[in-house]
Amino acid sequence: MAKNIKFDIEARDGLKRGVDALANAVKVTLGPKGRNVIIGKSFGGPTVTKDGVTVAKEIELQDPLENMGAQMVKEVASKTNDLAGDGTTTATVLAQAIVKEGLKNVAAGANPMDLKRGIDKAVEAIVADLTKQAKVVGSDSEKIKQIASISANNDEVIGELIANAFAKVGKEGVITVEEAKGTDTYVDVVEGMQFDRGYLSPYFVTNPEKMDAELENPYILLYDKKVSSLKELLPVLEPVAQSGKPLLIIAEDVDGEALSTLVVNKLRGALKIAAVKAPGFGDRRKAMLEDIAILTGGTVISEERGFTLENTTIEMLGTAKRVTIDKDNTTIVSGAGEADMIKNRVNQIKGQMEASTSDYDKEKLQERLAKLAGGVAVLYVGAASEVEMKEKKDRVDDALHATRAAVEEGIVAGGGVALLRAKNVLKDIKADNADEATGIQIVSRAVEAPLRTIVENAGLEGSVVVAKVAEGSGDFGYNAKTDEYVDMLKAGIIDPKKVTRVALENAASVAGMILTTECALVEIKEENAGGGQMGGGMPGMM
């Protein structure tokens, strides 16, 4: 494919046009009075959204050079979304501001490499100041509600639900978002450890109305192989039957003679018993069995460890306060495992998460962590129409990620105030030359952009409000929702520090690349050679 080569100002100007096209479409969504963007699809109905990254992902420009600029800023939005879960619009606005100021100076003869060094120094100083500004959230329900509400575009109902979910499962817990069947939005919390395996036979059911099996204070046998013959199980069944307690068998599988005999014993009332398959596959199954063993104070019966069913004693079985099994899931509540052992296992899983490079593995480890340490909450999102459902679900996802980020790194004043306050530290940075000093100034001006955009979206003059907020100190800022100057933290207008930090770092990174671009290679689209139409087949032929 032939390439068109663009140099110098021509290359950078083309990239800038692309940056502006994408950023202008995204930034209308910023702030409490941000507008909606409607996205037409070639199939299905249009999507209405106020989510920056959703808008960014849909943008493809016709001019290939402009499209490269747009794709670079799209990368800012996507990466910010991946790392922090929110702040995509802020990141896009910052990138546009740095590119705009930077290209002015490059056109005036500044050295792009020195500008970039100045920008990097300024960003480092601002991030350090944001860390000083940050306040710890911990498990403060009110703060969690405020953060979630803001990220869900000032929807206090969603904020309340997410705060409730966090209160119930803790920061180690897993909160997932599902579509509700009706129009109500609500939280459903699963206490204890739940895994997606149901009873192996409906004859194990103890509650025919609900079609589930409930075992009170059962013994739990954990076995990593298949159980086919009853003879293997007898050494365990006899002492359990004498104790009068129920028994739950979790094994790779239970079939044949073993399963039919267990069912007969259950139906005769000789033994309260249920059997389920072990969760997961391969190595993950072994790890999850070990998790259940630690949670219930039992031992996994595994030949790898020198244990067989024949020499299993009742002391090797786990116990729990209650186990509920339906056709799809098993839930173990209040396992009798030692707190120290559970804590060590949690730390071990956290270490594996940090070392893992696979998103899938991390997600599975996070699920295991939640089942051990916290619990699982499902946030069901209800809406009257499919379009509203999609939009609401996007907002709930954003709010959830922002809340996690806040719990992780703390909160700062929202509404663009934290960045505006942080720019005061830039006066003390020593620049090695004039162009580096200009790079620092570029960031100093760019950090005003989020507040300016919020104000302009509210229909007011950005410069006036920015000047007034800059005169103030601490958390003094502008509440665009009520058109008042307030203490941002007291008014509940807060941002997760992680979101603000990641947005600035990603914006500066991509803007720096655009500023230091001297040449762009663009593919020349070849016109299709005028070939004849394909001949028609016989009628009715596919």
Curated annotation (Swiss-Prot):
SUPFAM superfamilies: GroEL apical domain-like (SSF52029), GroEL equatorial domain-like (SSF48592), GroEL-intermediate domain like (SSF54849). CDD domains: GroEL. Keywords: ATP-binding, Chaperone, Cytoplasm, Isomerase, Nucleotide-binding. One of its GO terms (molecular function) is ATP binding. ATP binds at residues 29-32, 50, 86-90, 415, 495. The keyword Disulfide bond does not apply. GO terms for biological process: protein refolding. Disulfide bonds: none annotated. The keyword Acetylation does not apply. Its EC number is 5.6.1.7. GO terms for cellular component: cytoplasm. It is an enzyme of class 5 (isomerase). Its main location: cytoplasm. It is found in: Cytoplasm. It catalyses: ATP + H2O + a folded polypeptide = ADP + phosphate + an unfolded polypeptide. InterPro entries: Chaperonin_Cpn60_CS, Cpn60/GroEL, Cpn60/GroEL/TCP-1, GroEL-like_apical_dom_sf, GROEL-like_equatorial_sf, TCP-1-like_intermed_sf. Together with its co-chaperonin GroES, plays an essential role in assisting protein folding. The GroEL-GroES system forms a nano-cage that allows encapsulation of the non-native substrate proteins and provides a physical environment optimized to promote and accelerate protein folding. Belongs to the chaperonin (HSP60) family. HAMAP family: CH60 (MF_00600). Forms a cylinder of 14 subunits composed of two heptameric rings stacked back-to-back. Interacts with the co-chaperonin GroES. This is Chaperonin GroEL. The lineage of its organism: Bacteria, Pseudomonadati, Bacteroidota, Flavobacteriia, Flavobacteriales.
